Amino acid sequence: MKLLKNKKVTFVALLAILAVLSTQSVSAMHIMEGYLPLFWCIFWFAVFLPFFVVGLMRIKKIVAEDPNSKTMLALSGAFIFILSSLKIPSVTGSSSHPTGVGLGTAMFGPSVISVLGTICLLFQALLLAHGGLTTLGANAFSMAVVGPFVGYFVYKFAKSIKLSTPVSIFICAVIADLATYATTSIQLGLVFPDANSGFVGSALKFMGVFLTTQIPIAIVEGLLTVVLYNLISENVKERAGLFK
């Protein structure tokens, strides 16, 4: 009981580290409404949509096989929503934030997160002015597709070389977070190429700006994800098998 209490305290403390850094006075990291030309809005929606459809099919199958999985799906979605809603200033007056996709990715795979992450992004755009509707496809592709798929690949690789589940989940969460920001940097670089160095130079500049704050954020997110995994595996033991 004491160990459980300590882990709950650790979870709250790590979440507080992120929350205390958050601010409402800066623009969000998600690409804002009206920031992308119409062509790129349509393009990213078209690229993202197949992943969303596959994700819906995957969720339907999971729930049909195990109706009790709805609880863990809801928990994964809530974790994404809470963490990705935090706004943390970066060096330019823009902001960075955790993504929260690592936990659900490890439990259900990346396809499911393409749906859960998109739902979170939609609510954030409507309720928090975080991101936008026209840029939903671009934001979903980076945070709900690329981040989870890269994180899942790394998670499976870590498990294949016999790393422990907590370590594998930590790596998954960190890499998924960083992959999301790398993708967003590429998206912005395509739209706003540098006058001298072109797309590559612009994308690298965006990455440099975001990574200044994103690396420590990703590490804290990884630790937070591991603590939540430990709470799940110790208190809902029948769900521990989800982390294969």
From Swiss-Prot:
InterPro entries: CbiM, CbiM/NikMN
Compartments it resides in: Cell membrane
First and last residue of the signal peptide: 1-28
Top-rank taxon: Bacteria
Coiled coil feature spans: none
GO biological process: cobalamin biosynthetic process
Disulfide bridges in this chain: none
Membrane topology: Multi-pass membrane protein
Transmembrane annotation, as ranges: 36-56, 71-91, 108-128, 135-155, 166-186, 208-228
GO cellular component: ATP-binding cassette (ABC) transporter complex
Function (record text): Part of the energy-coupling factor (ECF) transporter complex CbiMNOQ involved in cobalt import.
Family that this chain belongs to: Belongs to the CbiM family.
Name recorded for this polypeptide: Cobalt transport protein CbiM
The gene coding this protein: cbiM
